[in-house]
Regions:
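N-terminal binding-site loop/beta-alpha segment at the start of enzyme catalytic domains
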Residues: 1-74, 131
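A short, structured active-site edge motif that brings together acidic residues
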Residues: 73-84, 108-112, 167-169
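Active-site groove signature of glycoside hydrolases
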Residues: 99-118
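Short, acidic/polar
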Residues: 27-39, 86-100, 148-153
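Structural motif
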Residues: 38, 42, 100-101, 133, ...
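Beta/alpha (TIM)-barrel catalytic core signal, keyed to glycine-rich beta->alpha loops juxtaposed to Asp/Glu
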Residues: 114-302, 309
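Active-site mouth loops of central-metabolism enzymes
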Residues: 19-30, 80-88, 112, 117
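Residues at the N-termini of beta-strands
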Residues: 15, 46, 105-108, 137, ...
Length: 311
């Protein structure tokens, strides 16, 4: 396993993080705990979850794992909240998340954008929790550059805690983060972790333009993913990547994961899992990287996606 130095915590954290969105939704509690165990055995020390994943079951499973293994101190927890970000809701959610996960603190706690709540209120609440030690660093999810800058002004004026982490989508199809987020976060010492390296499975090539989604796949379970990825420009990009896959004898998964994992500006790449192979694959890629020539070809094929607005 390769490890990144997270500037915001001054801590070595695995380049691959375990996304826990499937826990309690697509896989059982026992299966989830087994995957957490395998992840730790293979050097992964970051778990990413949310107050709302599987109506709280995801966090509860993580808490049960900590209770069994007694290894909370070895793991970095990233959790978050979306939707209603009123003071009352944030306070309730953080307190409940701490109880669910059997912990006295959350390493990174992320907030999204709530158009119905004043940003000052959101930043004040999470800052207070950081100062109390219940959050080590405040994080944000899917913020664009204008939201980051607006937040910074409020944080500086009010002496609120600044963001230490940005969680954002990033893959061969959605490359918008490269336009301005990367440089800004580097200057502000904000670590970046990315999610959806395979586009919720779209980048595996299993979905075809005009065809019905295969049963029990992510797009069948959660049809809203179609609004994000079923675009003509993405199907065209996938056709080009499939040609490269055939030419190089590397699968689409190998190509997509290798490219994302090679991006130095990402402190961590989150991998959603349903079985052990989903953990082993990115680790194997880190240990046996694809050569620069092929990575550059992927870069060239997908460069037009820099101008696309992230979902």
């Amino acid at each position: 396993m390769l490890y990144s130095n997270f500037k915001s915590l001054n801590k070595k954290i695995s380049k691959v993080g375990l996304g826990c969105v499937t826990f309690g939704r697509e896989i059982t509690e026992d299966e989830s705990i087994r995957l957490l165990d395998v992840a730790v055995e293979n050097g992964i020390n970051l778990f990413n979850t949310s107050y709302y994943y599987s109506d709280g079951i995801s966090e509860k499973i993580i808490g049960k794992f900590f209770k069994i293994k007694k290894n909370r101190k070895d793991i970095t927890i990233v959790s978050k909240i979306h939707g209603d970000l009123s003071k009352k809701t944030i306070e309730k959610c953080i307190h409940e998340s701490l109880i669910r996960m059997n912990t006295d603190h959350i390493d990174y706690y992320g907030v999204t954008h709530d158009p119905n709540t004043n940003l000052d209120e959101v930043l004040e609440v999470v800052s207070r929790f950081q100062k109390e030690g219940k959050i080590l660093r405040v994080a944000c999810n899917n913020y664009d550059i204008s939201m980051l800058k607006s937040s910074k002004k409020i944080q500086e004026i009010n002496n609120f805690s600044k963001f230490g982490l940005l969680e954002t989508v990033y893959n061969v199809l959605y490359r918008g983060a490269e336009k301005d987020l990367i440089n800004y976060c580097d200057l502000e010492n904000i670590d970046i972790i990315s999610y959806s390296p395979l586009g919720a499975g779209f980048i595996t090539g299993k979905y075809k333009n005009g065809k019905v989604s295969p049963k029990k796949t992510r797009f069948d379970i959660k049809p809203s993913h179609k609004d994000i990825y079923f675009k003509d420009v993405f199907f065209e990009t996938m056709n080009k990547l499939e040609n490269l896959s055939n030419e190089t004898n590397f699968s689409l998964i190998d190509l997509a994961l290798s490219w994302v994992l090679s991006r130095d500006f990402l402190s961590n790449v989150l991998i959603g899992v349903r079985d052990i192979s989903h953990i082993k694959k990115p680790i194997n890629i880190l240990e046996n990287p694809i050569n620069e020539i092929i990575l550059n070809e992927i870069n060239e094929i997908t460069k037009n996606n820099l101008d696309l607005i992230d979902p």
